[in-house]
Amino acid sequence: MSFTPEVVSRKSGVGVIPSPAPFLTPRLERRRPDSFSNRLDRDNKEVNVQVILRCKPLSEEEQKSSVPRVISCNEMRREVNVLHTIANKQVDRLFNFDKVFGPKSQQRSIYDQAIAPIVHEVLEGFSCTVFAYGQTGTGKTYTMEGGMRKKGGDLPAEAGVIPRAVRHIFDTLEAQNADYSMKVTFLELYNEEVTDLLAQDDSSRSSEDKQRKPISLMEDGKGSVVLRGLEEEVVYSANDIYALLERGSSKRRTADTLLNKRSSRSHSVFTITVHIKEESMGDEELIKCGKLNLVDLAGSENILRSGARDGRAREAGEINKSLLTLGRVINALVEHSSHVPYRDSKLTRLLRDSLGGKTKTCIIATISPSAHSLEETLSTLDYAYRAKNIKNKPEANQKLSKAVLLKDLYLELERMKEDVRAARDKNGVYIAHERYTQEEVEKKARIERIEQLENELNLSESEVSKFCDLYETEKEKLLDVESDLKDCKRNLHNSNKDLLDLKENYIQVVSKLKEKEVIVSRMKASETSLIDRAKGLRCDLQHASNDINSLFTRLDQKDKLESDNQSMLLKFGSQLDQNLKDLHRTVLGSVSQQQQQLRTMEEHTHSFLAHKYDATRDLESRIGKTSDTYTSGIAALKELSEMLQKKASSDLEKKNTSIVSQIEAVEKFLTTSATEASAVAQDIHNLLNDQKKLLALAARQQEQGLVRSMRSAQEISNSTSTIFSNIYNQAHDVVEAIRASQAEKSRQLDAFEMKFKEEAEREEKQALNDISLILSKLTSKKTAMISDASSNIREHDIQEEKRLYEQMSGMQQVSIGAKEELCDYLKKEKTHFTENTIASAESITVMDSYLEDCLGRANDSKTLWETTETGIKNLNTKYQQELNVTMEDMAKENEKVQDEFTSTFSSMDANFVSRTNELHAAVNDSLMQDRENKETTEAIVETCMNQVTLLQENHGQAVSNIRNKAEQSLIKDYQVDQHKNETPKKQSINVPSLDSIEEMRTLFSQNTLSEEHTSLEKISTKQGLGEANNRTPFLEVNK
């Protein structure tokens, strides 16, 4: 907070009449920056507003009524936890602050931990602000002011921030024995009006105006707040400040509410300004200025809970309005809004520099732990928590020169005296108060702008002078460096000359040493190569001996393998003979079984045909009986018709009764005839069904016999094919194993021969003359011996492989031929079986069609009889109904009916005869087809028997051929390699030892070499010849 009072305060006991001119801050001295500017740069960093939270204890009334506590404070972790449940809704929030003080905290601990560092900053020349914020009745005024001072002069334990800060400032300054001056102001903001609480009483004013002096609130050109009419009191001790604080507090507006017995109804600002003389190195005296603003805000108030009415309600509304504006300013600063509503309230205008300005600010948020104040407590915590994010840019106040300050104060005092004198004498210029105030404000703004520009000019000049000094310093350093560089170059040139001379001498010595070194190194290299060559030859000889031993071991393994092959082939021959015998027995059994099945099928076929012939004869006899019955019926009907015609002419009167009786007799006769005809037709139908079942049974039996024959033939084929495949696979595996064995032997022999020749040739080229001659002879003999042995073995293996391959190829051809013949036979058998099946199916289909035709015709006859019976019944019924009415007409039409009846029975007779003839023909045709089917089946059976016999003969011959060829291949043609007498015997080789080779080395004397090196060094030092050469030091060769 930065505001300027209008009038310079009075010394004690001396009253000064205030003038209309505002107080002007003394002009700064034009001077060069000092070391204090570094601290200004350090302090220009942004810092957050410090927020301290204090929770008051529950009051006595709250404790008596057992009000629940909803706030818990953790001072160590600096946390405040709000935990409460309202209508099944839980409130659980956690807040972190810079410092937290619980209900049991003391005034001294709060001041020492939170406020004392701020007072130190004030004494360092900064402007600082401390203000209390919170709900009414939470202890803001108690925190800022505290209890009354004791008479003895010591601060009580209840003393607040303001008295403790005053005592701290005075104690620090007195301890430093500093030269200082201090001024204080105390103002009140009530209902948006600023009043001076330290103003003197005036008898010309009313009792209300004596206590309240209005203060004008304005802003200068830089945005700082200017308070017109505010007086400053100069103080010399802490007791003076305590007295002023008690006097101003007594004038402050308070009231009794339900929440607080002494509730502050206004905001108060107590400001302490201190000027301290600073010690300097020269004669110049500087003064640093510090300012401490202690603000006690009125508490936010709930009108319903506080019981405020009328004027108190308006006061509460203004208080809440100003605090709400303060909250909006805090939100705008936290959210970095482009517009901050400072001008919405005088409170925020006064605190403008403390919130986001150049002042260090500390907020003390006070809350109540009671559940009744939960809403206000949460609001206070939210605003305080958001205020933590406000950033200020603290700047130390500019230091002043004491002489300039005294001069300005003297000029100001003289100007004020002239104004007082002019006012008494009424000799001066009088203008409107508003115009004068505006001109003074503009004048002050211009003066401050000029001062700012002068300060910037001074800073620029100081920087220019600083850079000039720096340039001169760097120039001097550059001259010194150039002189040093010249000396270094001269020394470097002399050192290079000496280095060249030393290099020439060094090169001459090195050339001599190189000659000796080359000679010794060549001798050493030749000796080393000889020893290495001898070692290599010895190693090669050892390898050759090992290889020969391996060769003999391999030959022993080959003999063992040949014996194993012979035993394996014998075993294979016995297994092959046993498998062929089993195959022959299986084929003979299958053939005999097939012959038996064919005979059974033939017997079933003969029995079926005989039974079918008997059934056909029976059918013919039944059809004849049916024809006789029908013929007798027709004859009876004709006789009856003639009798009716004779009696018709003589018995017309008795016609009714006689016709009725005759009709009944005709109905009975027709019913009997129909019954007999139905019985005959049913017998025919049953007989045909029996014939159909017998035919189907015979066909199924024949088909099952053929299927069994086909399955047995397939089983014979599969077993034969499996045996032949096994024979072929075994023979092929034997051939492949022998071939792989021979190839492996040949490859190993070739590799050994090539390796041995290469080693021998390499040894011949590298060995010395004598050793080379001995080794070449030994190598040539062994090479010839191994080549002969390997060539003989290879030729024998090739011949044996050819013979085995030819024998196995013959066996494979025989097995393949037998397999092909068997496959052809199976294909033929399958074709015959398919044809037989088709023929049987066709014959069955024909028989079924004939039987269905017979059944259809029998059903037609039955239907015809039923139709005739139904027509006669209908005619009789109609005739009975019309008999009484049409007796005479019936006599006339009797002849006509007789003719129709005769023609109808004639047509029926003819139709029945034709159908009976057709039935006889169908039965005869079926019988003929059965005979043809019998002949075909007998031919097929005879063919199958012949083919089975032929298969048996061919199979026996093929098995005999396979057995003969296997016996010839495995016993007669198989030969075993007989090479034991031709194989060379194992001989021992004399290999020289390493010690005998090491004895060939030439011994060198280390002393002789050392003497030669010493003499060479002395000679090279004396001569000093040669050019510079980058050579490594000479090393001893034999190390």
Curated annotation (Swiss-Prot):
InterPro entries: KIF11-like, KIF11-like_kin_motor_dom, Kinesin_motor_CS, Kinesin_motor_dom, Kinesin_motor_dom_sf, P-loop_NTPase
Principal location: cytoplasm
Annotated stretches, region: Disordered: 1008-1039
Domain of life: Eukaryota
Alphabetic keyword roster: ATP-binding, Cytoplasm, Cytoskeleton, Microtubule, Motor protein, Nucleotide-binding
GO process terms (BP): microtubule-based movement
Compartments in which it is found: Cytoplasm, Cytoskeleton; Cytoplasm, Cytoskeleton, Spindle
Gene Ontology, cellular component aspect: cytoplasm; microtubule; spindle
Compositional bias annotation for Basic and acidic residues: 1010-1020
UniProt KW ATP-binding keyword: yes
Keyword ATP-binding: yes
Coiled coil spans: none
GO MF annotations, alphabetized: ATP binding; microtubule binding; microtubule motor activity
Positions bound to ATP: G134, Q135, T136, G137, T138, G139, K140, T141
Domain Kinesin motor: 48-390
Job of this protein: Responsible for microtubule translocation. May be important for the organization of phragmoplast-specific arrays of microtubules. Plays an essential role in stabilizing the mitotic spindle. Required during mitotic cytokinesis.
Membership in a protein family: Belongs to the TRAFAC class myosin-kinesin ATPase superfamily. Kinesin family. KIN-5/BimC subfamily.
Name of the protein: Kinesin-like protein KIN-5B
Organism: Arabidopsis thaliana
Gene that this polypeptide is encoded by: KIN5B
